[in-house]
Amino acid sequence: MQSDKKLKVLIVGSGGREHALVLAVKRSPRLGGLVCAPGNGGIERDCEVAAIAADDIDAIVKYAKENAFDFVISGPEVPLSLGLGDKLRAAGIPVYGPSKNGAILEASKAYSKNFLKKYSIPTAEGKNFTDADEAEKYIRNAPFDTVIKASGLAAGKGVVIPATRDEAVAAAREMLEGGAFGDSGREIVVEEKMEGEEASIMLMVCGDKYVMLPASQDHKRVGEGDTGLNTGGMGAYAPAAVATPEVLDAVRKNIVAPTLAGLIKEGVDYRGTLYVGIMITKSGPKVVEFNVRFGDPECQVLMPLLESDLLTIMQACRNG
């Protein structure tokens, strides 16, 4: 039976995504108080902010305990990858967001690639490398054009889509030997460049149960006409018509079901957002990437579409 208690909520993060979450949570009749840490100049017009860095997870846990928050929502991936979810749960504070063993799906693209292969989930052909010479050999001999990905977190900027094999080799060496992306580039994923249209599928997950939000599409290239380097996202829209009912059925059957079953087999009690980036290819949707939080900018176009109470859905994910 759902409690009618008003909830004091802490949202962690400082971007447009967190502002969208603030505005959505504020619509909840169950809200009793709201703070965003660290927030930003726009967010502080809509709720109280606290000057605590999103990656200072010990300070966040201390602040949440001292101020008796009933619920914490982590916006970005970095706090989750550092174990914010684990530390809050250990302190008895409910949180929306996976534990560290779930957040590794985004924190390590190499882990994610191995996970996809292990559970036969459709994705691009590819291989993980820590040695630049081995990576070059693979790139030059591959029967397909390649994409080079830093394995670790890089704020959405760790993917290089080269125009030639020489560019691909240079990108791989820059990551593995030149220090591009720091520790995040010490291991890379070299994979087939897939052809098709991308879409972002956001799931709100509780173990083997989930709610799928409308498909969205973000545009990552920095330049006009979809040119230049990838960014975390230059803009987005939703719903994305390219994700037809047939595509979404295939996503549910061939991607979501084996992913959630695989997480359970790996001992992961996943509770939070799972973002599945897909490429809609001629042979069906394939996984481009996993993220363990709402996309930014996608969250900014999804939250205004939500008619249900976001806080209630998040609480249901947490409670099972």
Where are these regions (language model features)?
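Short acidic-hydrophobic, aromatic-tinged amphipathic segments that line or gate anion-handling sites
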Residues: 49-55, 127-131, 162
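Internal nucleotide-binding/catalytic subdomain
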Residues: 158-300
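Peripheral (often C-terminal) accessory segments that flank ATP-dependent C-N-forming ligase machineries
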Residues: 315-320
